[in-house]
Regions:
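Iron-sulfur cluster-binding electron-transfer modules in prokaryotic oxidoreductases
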Residues: 1-167
Length: 167
Protein backbone atom coordinates (compact mmCIF):
# COMPACT_ATOMS: atom_id res chain seq x y z
CA UNK A 1 0.00 0.00 0.00
CA UNK A 2 2.89 2.36 0.77
CA UNK A 3 4.33 1.92 -2.73
CA UNK A 4 0.96 2.67 -4.37
CA UNK A 5 0.47 5.77 -2.23
CA UNK A 6 3.93 7.01 -3.22
CA UNK A 7 3.07 6.63 -6.91
CA UNK A 8 -0.21 8.45 -6.38
CA UNK A 9 1.71 11.45 -5.03
CA UNK A 10 3.52 12.06 -8.33
CA UNK A 11 4.39 15.71 -8.85
CA UNK A 12 3.59 15.52 -12.56
CA UNK A 13 -0.13 15.53 -13.33
CA UNK A 14 -1.41 12.73 -15.54
CA UNK A 15 -3.46 14.11 -18.41
CA UNK A 16 -4.37 10.86 -20.18
CA UNK A 17 -2.59 11.71 -23.43
CA UNK A 18 -0.71 8.43 -23.76
CA UNK A 19 -1.58 6.42 -26.84
CA UNK A 20 -1.96 2.72 -26.12
CA UNK A 21 -1.48 0.31 -29.01
CA UNK A 22 -2.46 -3.31 -29.32
CA UNK A 23 0.53 -5.22 -30.72
CA UNK A 24 -1.31 -5.78 -34.02
CA UNK A 25 -1.91 -2.03 -34.28
CA UNK A 26 1.76 -1.39 -33.55
CA UNK A 27 2.75 -3.73 -36.37
CA UNK A 28 0.27 -2.13 -38.77
CA UNK A 29 0.46 1.55 -37.82
CA UNK A 30 3.97 2.06 -36.46
CA UNK A 31 6.14 -0.64 -38.07
CA UNK A 32 3.95 -1.12 -41.15
CA UNK A 33 2.99 -4.45 -42.68
CA UNK A 34 5.06 -3.66 -45.79
CA UNK A 35 8.18 -3.20 -43.68
CA UNK A 36 7.34 -6.36 -41.71
CA UNK A 37 7.04 -8.28 -44.98
CA UNK A 38 10.58 -7.18 -45.91
CA UNK A 39 11.93 -8.69 -42.66
CA UNK A 40 10.32 -12.13 -43.08
CA UNK A 41 12.91 -14.91 -43.48
CA UNK A 42 10.60 -17.91 -43.04
CA UNK A 43 7.41 -17.08 -44.97
CA UNK A 44 4.30 -19.17 -44.49
CA UNK A 45 3.99 -19.84 -48.24
CA UNK A 46 1.18 -22.17 -49.14
CA UNK A 47 -0.27 -22.09 -45.61
CA UNK A 48 -3.94 -21.24 -45.29
CA UNK A 49 -4.28 -19.35 -42.03
CA UNK A 50 -7.61 -18.47 -40.43
CA UNK A 51 -7.65 -15.37 -38.23
CA UNK A 52 -9.90 -15.63 -35.20
CA UNK A 53 -10.95 -12.26 -33.81
CA UNK A 54 -13.46 -13.43 -31.23
CA UNK A 55 -15.77 -11.00 -29.53
CA UNK A 56 -13.41 -8.82 -27.45
CA UNK A 57 -10.51 -7.77 -29.71
CA UNK A 58 -12.53 -5.25 -31.71
CA UNK A 59 -15.26 -4.35 -29.25
CA UNK A 60 -16.34 -1.87 -28.07
CA UNK A 61 -15.48 -0.49 -31.48
CA UNK A 62 -15.85 3.18 -30.53
CA UNK A 63 -13.33 2.82 -27.70
CA UNK A 64 -10.85 0.57 -29.48
CA UNK A 65 -11.23 1.84 -33.06
CA UNK A 66 -8.71 -0.76 -34.27
CA UNK A 67 -10.70 -2.14 -37.18
CA UNK A 68 -14.22 -2.71 -38.45
CA UNK A 69 -15.83 -5.01 -35.85
CA UNK A 70 -18.08 -6.66 -38.44
CA UNK A 71 -15.57 -7.06 -41.26
CA UNK A 72 -12.04 -6.74 -39.83
CA UNK A 73 -8.89 -7.06 -41.92
CA UNK A 74 -5.96 -6.39 -39.58
CA UNK A 75 -5.12 -10.05 -38.95
CA UNK A 76 -5.63 -11.01 -42.59
CA UNK A 77 -3.20 -8.23 -43.53
CA UNK A 78 -0.78 -9.59 -40.90
CA UNK A 79 -1.12 -13.09 -42.41
CA UNK A 80 -0.28 -11.70 -45.87
CA UNK A 81 2.74 -9.86 -44.44
CA UNK A 82 4.18 -13.12 -43.07
CA UNK A 83 3.60 -14.88 -46.39
CA UNK A 84 0.45 -16.83 -45.55
CA UNK A 85 -2.90 -17.01 -47.29
CA UNK A 86 -5.80 -15.69 -45.20
CA UNK A 87 -8.90 -17.84 -44.87
CA UNK A 88 -12.21 -16.01 -44.46
CA UNK A 89 -14.82 -18.03 -42.59
CA UNK A 90 -18.22 -17.39 -41.00
CA UNK A 91 -17.30 -17.74 -37.32
CA UNK A 92 -14.21 -15.50 -37.21
CA UNK A 93 -15.96 -12.79 -35.16
CA UNK A 94 -18.14 -15.02 -33.02
CA UNK A 95 -17.64 -15.78 -29.33
CA UNK A 96 -15.52 -18.84 -28.46
CA UNK A 97 -17.30 -19.32 -25.15
CA UNK A 98 -15.10 -16.86 -23.30
CA UNK A 99 -15.28 -16.95 -19.55
CA UNK A 100 -18.28 -19.30 -19.60
CA UNK A 101 -15.66 -22.06 -19.73
CA UNK A 102 -15.32 -21.57 -15.96
CA UNK A 103 -18.98 -22.38 -15.39
CA UNK A 104 -20.20 -24.41 -18.37
CA UNK A 105 -17.50 -26.27 -20.29
CA UNK A 106 -20.09 -27.89 -22.57
CA UNK A 107 -21.29 -24.51 -23.82
CA UNK A 108 -17.71 -23.31 -24.30
CA UNK A 109 -16.95 -26.51 -26.22
CA UNK A 110 -19.98 -25.94 -28.44
CA UNK A 111 -18.98 -22.34 -29.20
CA UNK A 112 -15.27 -23.02 -29.77
CA UNK A 113 -16.06 -26.17 -31.75
CA UNK A 114 -18.27 -24.14 -34.10
CA UNK A 115 -15.42 -21.68 -34.67
CA UNK A 116 -12.91 -24.41 -35.45
CA UNK A 117 -15.33 -26.37 -37.67
CA UNK A 118 -16.05 -23.21 -39.64
CA UNK A 119 -12.33 -22.53 -40.20
CA UNK A 120 -11.64 -26.15 -41.14
CA UNK A 121 -14.59 -26.21 -43.55
CA UNK A 122 -12.98 -23.31 -45.44
CA UNK A 123 -9.69 -25.19 -45.78
CA UNK A 124 -7.63 -23.61 -43.00
CA UNK A 125 -4.35 -25.29 -42.08
CA UNK A 126 -4.20 -23.41 -38.78
CA UNK A 127 -5.92 -20.69 -36.76
CA UNK A 128 -4.34 -17.64 -35.14
CA UNK A 129 -5.78 -15.44 -32.43
CA UNK A 130 -4.81 -12.36 -30.45
CA UNK A 131 -6.69 -13.27 -27.26
CA UNK A 132 -5.20 -15.57 -24.60
CA UNK A 133 -8.62 -16.78 -23.45
CA UNK A 134 -9.66 -17.54 -27.02
CA UNK A 135 -6.39 -19.43 -27.47
CA UNK A 136 -7.20 -21.54 -24.42
CA UNK A 137 -10.79 -22.24 -25.46
CA UNK A 138 -9.95 -23.08 -29.06
CA UNK A 139 -7.11 -25.40 -28.01
CA UNK A 140 -8.66 -27.08 -24.98
CA UNK A 141 -12.41 -27.02 -25.50
CA UNK A 142 -13.07 -27.25 -29.23
CA UNK A 143 -12.21 -30.92 -29.75
CA UNK A 144 -10.55 -29.96 -33.03
CA UNK A 145 -7.22 -31.22 -34.35
CA UNK A 146 -6.63 -27.96 -36.23
CA UNK A 147 -3.62 -26.21 -34.65
CA UNK A 148 -4.21 -22.85 -32.94
CA UNK A 149 -1.47 -20.30 -32.31
CA UNK A 150 -1.15 -16.90 -30.74
CA UNK A 151 -0.29 -14.56 -33.62
CA UNK A 152 3.08 -13.68 -32.09
CA UNK A 153 4.16 -17.33 -32.37
CA UNK A 154 3.86 -17.09 -36.16
CA UNK A 155 5.54 -13.69 -36.11
CA UNK A 156 8.54 -15.18 -34.30
CA UNK A 157 8.78 -18.05 -36.80
CA UNK A 158 8.42 -15.74 -39.79
CA UNK A 159 11.18 -13.45 -38.49
CA UNK A 160 13.48 -16.38 -37.73
CA UNK A 161 13.34 -15.87 -33.97
CA UNK A 162 11.76 -19.27 -33.31
CA UNK A 163 12.46 -22.59 -34.98
CA UNK A 164 10.36 -22.68 -38.15
CA UNK A 165 7.49 -25.13 -38.12
CA UNK A 166 5.77 -23.73 -41.19
CA UNK A 167 6.79 -26.21 -43.87
Amino acid sequence: AMKVNNYLKLSEPYSGETTVYHYLELLRDVVGFDKLKEKVVNPFKGKKIAAYYGCLLLRPSKALAMDDPENPAIMEDFIKAIGGTPVIYAQRNECCGGYITMEDKAQAAKRSGAVMDSAKDQGADMVITACPLCLYNLRKNSGSDLPVYYFTELLAEALGLKEANNE
